[in-house]
Amino acid sequence: MTNGHIRVSRRWVVACLLAGAADRAFGLPLSHSPRPELRPAGPVASGADALIEAARLGGKIGFVVADARTGAVLEARNPILRLPPASTAKAVTTLYALAKLPPDYRFQTRVLATGPVRGGRVEGDLVLAGTGDPVLDTDTLAGLAAGLKAAGVREVAGKFRYFAGALPHLKVIDPEQPDHVSYNPAVSGLNLNFNRVLFEWHRASAGWDVTMDARSNSYRPRVGMSRMRVVNRQSPIYTYDDRAGTDDWTVASAVLGNGGSRWLPVRKPALYAAEVFQTLARSHGIVLPAPVAAPALPQGAVIVAHDSPVLRELLTDMLKYSTNMTAEVIGMTATYAGGGHPVSLSGSAAAMNDWLGETLGIRRARFVDHSGLGSGSRIAAADMVKLLVAAGADGPLRPLMKPVWLRDAKGRPVKDHPVRIRAKTGTLNFASALTGYVTTADGRELAFATFMADEERRAKLDRASRERPKGGRSWATRARTLQLKLIERWATLYGA
């Protein structure tokens, strides 16, 4: 071992692991070179070491770059050191979902009537039933309400129920995150607007005018299940309480200024969706009673329904925008499709861990969720590259990944650069990851994974400081710069 880089013997072992795994995982034909082409260890290692030293990250760094078609390892540093994957976990979730669900899978949201419709009146209950659609939004609910009117419904004799039991209701993705961060919402079988509500405030003659609404491009329905009170204090900025069936928030007056807005997480997404649907139905002249939860899916006739985009489109957007809720919904749905019945994210992630072991022989990785938000997830660069090689340079994952561009001396993306990258980024506090595929200027395909984390600094953060820790932004910028410089170097050194 020299400066964390692998000498010939261990590089060969890792190369064999990467190449051999591909056959077992997805049945993809790969051509194996009998031995990876080895280059002089000294200059190669020193080049990467200089970049790492210049980044001044501290902590631990692990990376592997390999030929994406043969699995031959070209360079590695701490390849079997397990580090936080952050949102690169979504690449694993993507392949897990594609293995368990058809690529044209859709989530369906339905409006059911448990009795006949006579003279515009539902002689029974009306039911809003979800299957977990992670991209259901207010505009879509408005379309369902319009469809209800078009079907001739004007009133309901029974109750207005909502069903969200297709997936378990989980109030948060990661309990270690601050209460108010919108990237850590609830997850359920009936979701809306990525389970976020818009808090908006304006200065008034006596304090502030405050609204909480389910805003979309076309609508601003206010909600009552999430409430905000302005409190005369300096800190904490936000507090949250689950009170009498509502999300009860307070905000410190000292931070509000003259006005602004912010998305906050919703902890009762099914009730949120039902309340918004009730409001939108009223705009079409349909008066619904207060929504109540249905413990089981009622039997009834479908009046109107909405299908989500197909799975591949959902995965593409999930990888592009790194939406945590989408990852958790799709991951749990995949586990259910595989015969599992998890009641927690960790339980569903355990099923994904088992799948990694059974299909790829990856048994050291540990995921605690499907998004990478949880701090307990760990994977080694060698195992992530093994997954990428198994998926294939021409396989299902690469076209779903977003393009990443190398940068010029001023940090601007060079979109016409001959080196092309498709990858997934990942960022947590003092942890950064980038993993994906590179096409070099002369056409060679590489698979890579880079993981960087300062675990000591991460461990010192308290819950309140995790949204914007001191020094976190500059650390993340240096980490991302290092990752791109490593890729640029690999593309130059290991071109065909």
Q: What are the language-model segments listed below?
A:
Residues 28-53, 100-363, 442, 460-466, ...:
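Conserved serine DD-peptidase/penicillin-binding transpeptidase domain
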Residues 77-83, 263, 371-374:
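A short glycine/serine-rich beta->alpha loop
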Residues 64, 127, 326-329, 366, ...:
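Structural recognition of the beta-strand scaffold that forms the well-ordered cores
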Residues 59, 76-96:
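Short active-site loop at a secondary-structure junction
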Residues 335-496:
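Small-residue-rich helix-loop
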Residues 2-7, 11-29:
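N-terminal export signals
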Residues 53-77:
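A short, well-structured edge-of-sheet supersecondary motif
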Residues 71, 90-97, 160, 190, ...:
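Residue-level preference for non-acidic, small/hydrophobic
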